[in-house]
Amino acid sequence: DIVLPSAHWFEQVDLGFLFSTHPYLLWQDSQYFLHLNRWNSTSGVWQDCYTGTELAQYADIAADNSGVYVTYTTGSFPYVLHAFRFDNAAGTVSLLGDVIADNACNMEIAAANGSIGIGYRDLNDNNVPKLAVWDGTAWNTTTLSEQDCGTISVLADGNSIWVVPSGGKTDVFRWESGTVTNIPLPEAVQGRAFQMTPAVAQGNFYMTVNAQNPEEFVLYGLNKDGTWSLTGNPIAQSMVNQPVLAAQKQALYCLYATSDLQMQLKKLTLETETPAVTGDVNGDGTANLADTVLLQKYLLGETALTAAQAKAADLQADDSINGFDLAVLRQLLTKVA
């Protein structure tokens, strides 16, 4: 078991993982000062990485293979939005730019293959949802909708960032390489989606919808043509509290609290995918010269790979993509020919 850091009171707790295995804990104490800890598996203790010195009402954490990223607000009102990066190797904290927004809340942060995105509700602009993306030197902010929203969920998916504002007035948004795609909500929940929680499984996007009037808690999957389908039976015939949606292999797991504060965990087993073709880097169902070209461009730094493409390109299964994988692919195609 991993014991939480000693504290008189936890106001909010978030968990992030570096390299998918190293736990980081972001929490606020009774004064709403921010703390970042990392777990030392050798000594069995939480190590201090960062301690804030001013009020932080809202905060969230994300991580990728290069660092841990934290977004937070300062002040009791307005809530000034900031972000920093913790360098695991150096043990240092560096601010990412200056102020991101003068008055924001309900934000979440995601790290998508080097792109850092923060979705937030702008309290100085009629509560509309916005997305700020860090380009390495500055924040580029996009207003996603002119309609107001409540909470905002953000999810990294390969090179993409999904932004899901609650309230049922806005679309779902997908950002990739500076381009935002709008996906209208399912018609049945427009205007009554109190809360939505996203996940990606087997390359497909899913979201739970906590709906009002009538009350129900359902799961939708996004089809390839941009339409939505109800997935499985309703999770609950009532509104729920604090839902969490997560994907693991061929299943989706949903954890939530019922109206009488009972915890429920539901599992949905997804259809098994067709076995992958070895060497099919671009995902078109066959291994051919196009896969070699794509992998070579990636190694030359001319293009990026999605998470699925990167998995297919790791032909040596050593958690890295390099010239040896390209050599294996060429040898494989020679045998096929």
Per-range role (PLM):
Residues 1-273:
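Extracellular, repeat-based ectodomains that mediate carbohydrate processing or recognition
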Residues 272-337:
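Cellulosome-associated attachment modules in secreted, modular CAZymes
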